Regions:
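Accessory carbohydrate-recognition regions in carbohydrate-active enzymes
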Residues: 23-166
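Bacterial Sec-dependent N-terminal signal peptides
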Residues: 1-23
Length: 166
């Protein structure tokens, strides 16, 4: 009887140990959470206290156009809205969760073909350099972001170090 108890206890401990090894806290992180509506978060990459917060931007809406406040600008203060179907570029500085505009990002956009200097409209991306994307090809995990830019056939992959984004 005593032997049976020891065996059951050891098997239970072994199973618990294997379960703990397979699951790390980082496995539960989903950077997409909070990227829609007024969540003001971005799905991109950064390191703790890093200089770079590299992430896609789905639109850039100015706060003021000809003296008129743009009410949708507030939704884009982190640069990314999950509901959007296009990416206008990737930038290296973002604030997450602040609810305030961020750092005057400079966009980079990989592309092939003719040079286009206008981002185009979300409803007609062909007139500019923005590209459609599909969430099925988007991957966001701590330290890594990937998305297929459908209009260019380019897989964009992002990661960051303490002082740079790649």
């Amino acid at each position: 009887m005593n032997n049976l108890r020891k065996k059951v206890l050891m098997m239970t401990m072994a199973a618990a140990t294997l379960s703990a090894i397979a699951q790390q806290p980082v496995d539960y992180v989903n950077p997409i959470i909070g990227t829609n509506g007024m969540g003001h978060t971005f799905p991109g990459v950064c390191t703790p206290f890093g200089w770079v917060q590299l992430s896609p931007d789905t639109d850039t809406i100015p706060h003021n156009v000809n003296g008129a406040y743009q009410k949708n600008a507030y939704e884009y203060c982190a640069g990314y809205q999950y509901r959007d179907k296009t990416i206008v570029g990737f930038s290296h500085t973002h604030l997450s969760g602040t609810g305030h505009s961020d750092l005057g990002d400079i966009l980079l956009m990989p592309a092939v073909g003719d040079v286009k200097l206008n981002p185009g409209r979300a409803d007609y991306p062909e007139e500019g350099y923005r590209s459609r994307f599909n969430h099925a090809t988007e991957k966001a995990v701590p330290g890594y972001y990937e998305v297929m830019l459908d209009d260019y056939g380019i897989k964009a992959q992002l990661t960051a170090t303490q002082r740079t984004g790649i």
